[in-house]
């Protein structure tokens, strides 16, 4: 009699639900998954090696391109590692700006996660709504850095420049009528802080809108409740962090447990799940929208009342002001030296971690006293989550695999590095 064997199937890398270039080799018994073997490396760009041949400052833009959905948070961990080795004091205003943009980035990340996760499961409306809000947040990125995504805004010792006093305005064109432009520029009459404040006032209603569409939706619950269950013990053993760990009921958040920058001065809560399934992880991230909004509001209030420097006064690390360079030759030479040769970091090693939207994002930096890192190791949260995919999907149907990949919020820029 012929032997009955499991069916082997390729999932991805050209699959709309693969979230990038994920290739899974699935072993199936009928439509039930027996084993899921992730094959990674299709987006490997050698970031860790590239950083060894670039000055410390030149590697900042590489960080944006790791998890290309949470740009500024990646930069944050990198500059914090450099600051640890240098023993640099970051001005308080710069710390508040960093925290504010970290939370803006968290909302940006979760909006894309929500839209893509819902679209994978079959709910299209949320995807369109999420991109409407992302547009406003990209405008905030653009106002401070000139780039809508890869900002390269953080610097060792602070940030590139202070927040602008006025927002860029839309102009009339062949595709935008006078009425359209007037409507678009309505909330752009003030400063960037006014624009962000206007967004934070509108955003809670948008979150309620997403919840109306999904939270009590019968089909959404059927597709997510009891799917991809991870117990608290297994979540910790598998190295999960962020919403994946908190969804299983473990209240671990670096912003509370190991506060960095000014998080210990701010008032916010850490949402946790109960059952550790896709639905609980969805609820955790939805509540994170509201908590991030709370943090941004507190940062706006503080930044309005406290002007000041936004980068360290250590001239070995920070460039001279642009106004000075226009009439002082010494300042121009100083600027040129800083951006060609770079600054030297004392020999030693440091690990800096931030609460990234996906989990704990860490940078382990080793310096040999040169102007380039001797070794840069990136701890990507998605890497540990993808490693747990096999365990999470066993016994589930192929259709549930799509929901589990969505709940993990995988981005291959950071996994393949």
UniProtKB/Swiss-Prot annotation:
Keywords of the record: Cell inner membrane, Cell membrane, Membrane, NAD, Quinone, Translocase, Transport, Ubiquinone
PROSITE patterns assigned: COMPLEX1_49K
Protein EC: 7.1.1.-
Class in the EC hierarchy, top level: translocase
Subcellular location: Cell inner membrane
An example Gene Ontology molecular-function term: NAD binding
Membrane topology: Peripheral membrane protein
Catalytic reactions on record: a quinone + NADH + 5 H(+)(in) = a quinol + NAD(+) + 4 H(+)(out)
An annotated GO cellular component: plasma membrane
SUPFAM superfamilies to which the protein is assigned, alphabetical: HydB/Nqo4-like (SSF56762)
InterPro entries, A to Z: NADH_Q_OxRdtase_suD, NADH_UbQ_OxRdtase_49kDa_CS, NDH1_su_D/H, NiFe-Hase_large
Origin: domain of life: Bacteria
HAMAP family xrefs: NDH1_NuoD
Family membership noted in the UniProt record: Belongs to the complex I 49 kDa subunit family.
Function: NDH-1 shuttles electrons from NADH, via FMN and iron-sulfur (Fe-S) centers, to quinones in the respiratory chain. The immediate electron acceptor for the enzyme in this species is believed to be ubiquinone. Couples the redox reaction to proton translocation (for every two electrons transferred, four hydrogen ions are translocated across the cytoplasmic membrane), and thus conserves the redox energy in a proton gradient.
Quaternary organization: NDH-1 is composed of 14 different subunits. Subunits NuoB, C, D, E, F, and G constitute the peripheral sector of the complex.
Protein name per its UniProtKB record: NADH-quinone oxidoreductase subunit D
Gene: nuoD
